[in-house]
Amino acid sequence: SKQLLKLISEHLEQTVTEPTKKTLSWNEPDDELRFWKEFFKTGNIDDFFPEILKRTTHTHNPKYVGHQVGVTAPITLLTGMLSNLLNNGMAVYEMGMSPNAIERIVTEKLCKAIGYDSPSGGFLTSGGTLANLTALLSARKAKVPHDVWNLGHAQPLGIMVCEEAHYCVDRAAKIMGLGKKGIIKVPANRNFVIDVEQLETYYQRSIAKGIRIFAIVGSAPSTATGAYDDLEAIQQFAEKYNLWFHVDGAHGGAAIFSEKYTHLLKGAEKSDSMVIDGHKMMMMPTITTALLYRNKKHADHTFSINADYLLSETEEDEWYNSGRRTFECTKTMMCLHWYVLLKVYGEKVFNTYVTRQYDLGKEFEKLLLKEPDFEIATSPMSNILCFRYTDSNLSQEDLNEINAKVRQALLEDGEFYLVQTKLRGTLYLRTTLMNPFTTREHLESLLKKIRTRAKKLIPSRVRQ
């Protein structure tokens, strides 16, 4: 264990401070599989941890600008070790006395930060996908008079969501048996946020088809572009028709702690439920998500279970038996990450981190707007920004192909790591600026590298 901690310490120092350190060492999938098969047969176990460090993606590298995976605070290594060793499942109080108490403290602080009044509450669960599913199950339980949980659907049901929302909302609706027709996707406007002017039209159209709408979801922000929906307008619409208003703040819900950017979440304080991932913008390891309710009774009533060997029948508020509220019967002591970060650093650490990364998104936009051979998809509202190399002499098809090839070349090169996305048929390079060590100089270097590679890929017919 001492050797591993020394190895990790050296890895972190080198990753952050050495400019030549790669973000990843690319291997083809079959080659990677072949390596680990052979290692299992003949490899020395002493080499296992060094190989893992060498053959994984380094999120602490300042040139990591890829997926929405948080750069973990080193102190969470210790909370993770403790959780893994003690292995308290938490479903019932006696299998998680401290973590159940700690989880309540954490969720109460989060509810207060959102702006929920008493009797708000919530719990931690394993990821935004599961949290969004659970929230929509709560919505159905609260807003549909028929007992769907025990008796099945009595009529077609539906939820409203922007077409740019994370795919997990679509997946949750299908898991719930709503079907394709039960997912009412409202178009996005030119800024890739829900077009609130079309809410009424899509609602009435669904009602005319016999679909009972029971919930509407606001993205804070959407995954592809990092754009925040107008939560205040959605809340007013939800109130008009007595719909459950859920905020998917998996990525950007942490902006509740940012004095500069908390306005992006205006309206969330009146939502019925909200999701915030700790492993995105709160510097925690995967996977930990808070699901918060404006009225905590909805958390208690979502699931009807018959598990006498676990829980005794009682009408009391058994907050200490978390298995009553979560989809999981067993979960990790993920609350330790939240509690320790809040205890050691306070809420100000999230204010500093979120504000710094969102500011960097704006700075990157300014940098791109000065470059004639780059264009952005939309002005960033967070630390997510979509852009592409462009050339007026090239067709849309050519540009899509060039940008895709540039991205693959960067992946194989390993110095930088970024991803790609398609928006209305146009392929963009997509950066999520998660790393607090990433600077303007790193981003300038990235653009220079993209430009150099892109120019080499311009078809000869265009060069001539």
Predicted regions and their residues:
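A non-catalytic, amphipathic alpha-helix used as a structural packing/dimerization or gating element
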Residues: Q3-L7, A101-I105, K109, T352-E363, ...
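Active-site C-terminal subdomain of aminotransferase-like
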Residues: S222, K266-E371
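N-terminal entrance/gating region of PLP-dependent enzymes' catalytic architecture
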Residues: K2-P119, L411-E412, F416, M434, ...
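Conserved small-domain helix->loop->beta segment predominantly found in fold-type I
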Residues: T23-N27, D317-R356, E365-D398, E415-T426, ...
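Short, glycine-/Ser/Thr-/acidic-enriched flexible segments
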Residues: G70, E164-H166, R190-N191, P221-T223, ...
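Short loop-beta-helix segment that forms the pyridoxal 5′-phosphate
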Residues: L110-L137, I184-P187
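PLP-dependent enzyme catalytic core of the Aspartate aminotransferase-like
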Residues: K422-Q464
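Conserved PLP-enzyme active-site core in the AAT-like
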Residues: A131-D300
